[in-house]
Amino acid sequence: RDVAPSRGLGDVYKRQVVKANDDKPIKVTQLPQSAQQFIKSHFGNSKVAIAKMETDWLDKSYDVIFTDGNKLEFDKQGNWKEINCKYSAVPTSVIPAPILKYVSDNYPDAKVLKIERDKRDYEVKLSNRWELKFDLQFNLIDIDN
């Protein structure tokens, strides 16, 4: 016997969850102005492969992926949240001076490949596989390799 698929609350919830996490390709000109300026200032010679707007419940963020594999993530205001330069180094112009000084003093041969920031801290991944965590006053609070 044929049974029609259920349209219970579970199905409605599943559809809403899928809709709640939505990635949409956008043009670079649709990024917040501060994100556009950041790209021009620090990644001006890089070619954008894709820019995406991510909507997750009530929050919004933006991803920019370059043809060289570098990736930027911005919050809804266009402030950078993550800079990931797998095959090169994060431009020193975007690394906070105290973090840059700590890295150059303690790991002079290492490059910063990735830096993330949020409301609590900065996380830095180096080319020598060390991972450093700084609080918002740039005090080293954790180290891992």
What residue spans do the PLM features occupy?
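Single conserved hydrophobic/aromatic residue that forms the stacking wall/gate
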Residues: 1-16
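Interaction-mediating elements
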Residues: 19-145
